[in-house]
């Protein structure tokens, strides 16, 4: 039994008012932090969307972001300290009340006296035998009850102290985002952490049922930073890779069995817990992260065993990991792989019996987790901050002094064509493969996880966030693009459009991701396509506004090339076509044709939309004609299929956020978010887009296979833009604008714009 730090006399006369006052002070602090939350969030948003230049670009934003995160941690820690103090006060008050009742009431009633120091006695003089024995029994009982009260107090006192230590965290300079509601909860978390460590020390000796229990314990506390750090530090980096390698490779799990499910749950829960632990900035966890990275190239269990990278990357498939750790770990992993004199599959997939992964459809399809880069890419896809830093442009990829300034524009003609080494290696040079059963590695052009990581890096959004179920919540977060994500997008456009224009055709799995990226940068794409003249584009700066002046800087020609590359891919072609349609509707809704000036602005956006559509349509037609040169039937089937992007089913517009994004669904589960022009009306856009879908559905029956000639395909593309123009012209007429006498502008600009777009592709887009 724990020894109490409080004596009988101290407990009896303990002044608890100060403890109660401390709890109320923490409660007041919580309420103050709640009142300041909106200001803190606004500060973070302003910092994120501001255009930073000079040294501030790399210093201010990370600093402010960190302070906002610390603000949230401070609020959670303050609430936890309040809760623990309240609970602790209640426990001490209960012990004191029990003791007072015993001393002041129960003992005197039994003829027993308790001294100021807690000594129990009774006056036995002159008592008969039975009364004397009763008094002696009462002395023993009262003394025992005092001992029991002090014993419980000792336990409570130790638990309160331990809970407060857990709440304080391990870093004296940072707040700890713990979230305990009681002393008991903190004690259970600490006990569970110790129980988990005891179980994991047994490694592969654990039964299947024990693996299930271990996964439950970890999952229960996956978001508890104190629990997570206790487990991570207790295991140590070597213990982590030894444990998972032993579990994953030490027994034969069969898919569909409870044992397999337990292994998958354990992998996910352990990854979640380790991710939470890395979010701590304590010295101990920073050393842990460094040591884990350093042992990645070591063999687990000696020569012939799997590398540490394989075990840790399997655990990266779930969890919210610290961006610094992911960047350092990723650099070490790829450096080790690239230094290897041979194919990556020979380095990682040397043992066909090895399994490291049990998660997701990939495991069911045969992804045994023998490619550690996949786990890294999945983690980067969930962590945009890390992905953006991982794919940041090198020093040689410097902006030129061209227009606009600021921000500066990347000049693809300058002597700085080298993009991020990791980006180019993973996109076009690396050998990707799947581990399928006990067979040899199955080569693939590129893995989906790389597309997810690149999407996160270039847009600031975690992969997979734009779905029908999450759209409203995600769009409420606003436009996540920053100067840093835009510089990644510069490289993506340059790599896929200019440096390696056939790369997307060679890696079609990238089509949906690149189409989604283009959708989020549709404002910049329209700006650069609008004119090849710098002076003319200046007039379109407001029409195709970019958040806080930050703009992708690939210029007119490079943007045409990028669109051409996307147009050659069926999925990307459809996504760009749909994104352009919605984006232009947004621009039109923000430019109601109330006068000649407004009408001309709207017609300029329609003309640009026609050019964009002409570029991607021309690219798609030429690709289909080349690929199916000797099969006319397949050519017309492919053309009809590529023209049916509008078949997103019912309403194409799923939702819109107040921060200026709209989202459209796309067949196959992909989705695109599109920036809205300032002043755009999301409800109106949705209404018009749905009307467009209904109109096209009526004119083009949804048959199992639509066939279309090249001429019909181009006519359909031009008609889509003509629908935009007709909507706008009708709106102008309804406002009373005399198009013949006041504007003197011939309608049907979409025809000239569409033809010009096709010409642009033929001139520079191939």
PLM feature segments, named:
Residues 168, 172-181, 680, 688:
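Mature, well-folded catalytic/scaffold domains that follow N-terminal targeting or propeptide regions
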Residues 1, 54, 653-677:
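Short hydrophobic membrane-inserting alpha-helices and related fusion/pore-forming segments
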Residues 1-170, 755-766:
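N-terminal secretion-targeting helices of virulence/extracellular proteins
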Residues 173-658, 701-753:
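Non-catalytic all-alpha helical scaffold/repeat segments
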Residues 7, 15-20, 589, 662-667, ...:
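Compositionally biased amphipathic helical and low-complexity segments enriched in hydrophobic
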Residues 668, 741, 748-765:
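Membrane-insertive, amphipathic helical modules of secreted toxins and fusogens
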Residues 116-144, 351-357, 658-671, 738:
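Flexible coil/linker segments and helix-coil junctions enriched in charged and small residues
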Residues 651, 682-698, 703:
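Amphipathic interfacial alpha-helices that partition to lipid-water interfaces
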């Amino acid at each position: 039994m724990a020894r109490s730090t409080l004596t009988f006399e101290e407990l009896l006369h303990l002044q608890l008012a100060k403890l109660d006052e401390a709890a109320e002070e923490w409660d007041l602090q919580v309420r103050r932090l709640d009142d300041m939350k909106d200001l803190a969030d606004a500060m973070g948003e302003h910092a994120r969307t501001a255009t930073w230049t000079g040294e501030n670009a790399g210093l201010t934003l990370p600093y402010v972001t960190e302070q906002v995160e610390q603000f949230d941690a401070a609020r959670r820690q303050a609430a936890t300290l309040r809760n623990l103090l309240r609970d602790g006060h209640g426990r001490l008050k209960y012990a004191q009340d029990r003791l007072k009742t015993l001393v002041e009431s129960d003992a005197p009633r039994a003829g027993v006296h308790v001294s100021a120091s807690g000594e129990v006695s009774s006056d036995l003089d002159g008592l008969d035998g039975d009364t004397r024995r009763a008094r002696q029994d009462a002395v023993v009982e009262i003394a025992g009850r005092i001992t029991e009260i002090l014993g419980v107090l000792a336990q409570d006192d130790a638990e309160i102290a331990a809970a407060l230590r857990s709440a304080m965290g391990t870093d004296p300079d940072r707040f700890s985002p713990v979230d305990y509601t009681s002393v008991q909860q903190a004690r259970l978390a600490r006990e569970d952490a110790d129980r988990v460590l005891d179980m994991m020390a047994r490694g592969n000796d654990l039964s299947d049922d024990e693996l299930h229990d271990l996964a439950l314990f970890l999952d229960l506390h996956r978001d508890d930073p104190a629990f997570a750090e206790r487990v991570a530090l207790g295991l140590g980096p070597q213990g982590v890779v030894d444990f998972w390698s032993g579990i994953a490779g030490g027994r034969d799990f069969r898919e569909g069995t409870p044992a397999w499910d337990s292994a998958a749950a354990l992998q996910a829960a352990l990854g979640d817990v380790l991710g939470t632990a890395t979010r701590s900035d304590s010295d101990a966890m920073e050393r842990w992260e460094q040591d884990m990275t350093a042992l990645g190239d070591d063999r687990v269990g000696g020569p012939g065993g799997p590398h540490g990278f394989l075990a840790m990357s399997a655990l990266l498939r779930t969890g919210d990991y610290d961006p610094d750790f992911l960047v350092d770990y990723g650099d070490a992993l790829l450096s080790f792989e690239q230094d290897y004199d041979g194919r990556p599959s020979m380095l990682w997939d040397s043992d066909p019996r090895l399994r490291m992964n049990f998660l997701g459809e990939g495991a069911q399809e045969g992804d045994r987790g023998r490619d550690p880069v996949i786990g890294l890419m999945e983690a980067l896809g969930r962590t945009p901050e890390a992905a953006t830093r991982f794919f940041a442009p090198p020093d040689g990829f410097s902006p030129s002094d061209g227009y606009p300034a600021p921000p500066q524009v990347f000049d693809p003609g300058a002597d700085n064509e080298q993009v991020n080494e990791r980006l180019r290696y993973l996109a076009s040079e690396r050998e990707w493969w799947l581990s399928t059963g006990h067979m040899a590695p199955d080569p693939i052009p590129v893995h989906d996880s790389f597309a997810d990581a690149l999407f996160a890096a270039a847009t600031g959004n975690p992969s997979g966030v734009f779905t029908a179920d999450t759209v409203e919540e995600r769009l409420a977060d606003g436009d996540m693009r920053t100067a840093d994500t835009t510089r990644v997008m510069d490289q993506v456009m340059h790599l896929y459009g200019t440096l390696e224009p056939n790369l997307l055709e060679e890696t079609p799995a990238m089509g949906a991701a690149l189409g989604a990226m283009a959708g989020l940068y549709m404002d910049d794409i329209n700006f650069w396509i609008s004119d090849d003249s710098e002076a003319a584009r200046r007039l379109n700066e407001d029409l195709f506004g970019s958040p806080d002046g930050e703009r992708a800087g690939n210029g007119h020609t490079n943007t045409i090339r990028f669109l051409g590359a996307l147009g050659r891919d069926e999925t990307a072609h459809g996504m760009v076509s749909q994104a352009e349609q919605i984006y232009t509707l947004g621009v039109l809704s923000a430019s109601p044709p109330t006068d000649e000036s407004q009408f001309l602005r709207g017609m300029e956006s329609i003309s640009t939309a026609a050019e964009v559509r002409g570029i991607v349509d021309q690219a798609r037609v030429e690709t289909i004609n080349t690929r199916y040169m000797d099969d006319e039937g397949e050519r017309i089937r492919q053309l009809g299929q590529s023209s049916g992007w509008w078949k997103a089913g019912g309403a194409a517009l799923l939702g819109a956020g107040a921060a200026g994004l709209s989202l459209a669904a796309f067949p196959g589960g992909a989705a695109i978010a599109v920036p809205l022009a300032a002043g755009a009306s999301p409800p109106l856009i949705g209404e018009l887009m749905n009307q467009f879908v209904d109109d096209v559905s009526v004119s083009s029956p949804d048959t199992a296979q639509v066939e279309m000639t090249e001429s019909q395909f181009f006519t359909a593309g031009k008609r889509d833009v003509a629908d935009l123009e007709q909507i706008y012209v009708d709106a102008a007429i309804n406002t009373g604008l005399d198009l013949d006498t006041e504007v003197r502008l011939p309608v049907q600009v979409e025809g000239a714009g569409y033809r010009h777009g096709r010409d642009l592709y033929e001139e520079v887009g191939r």
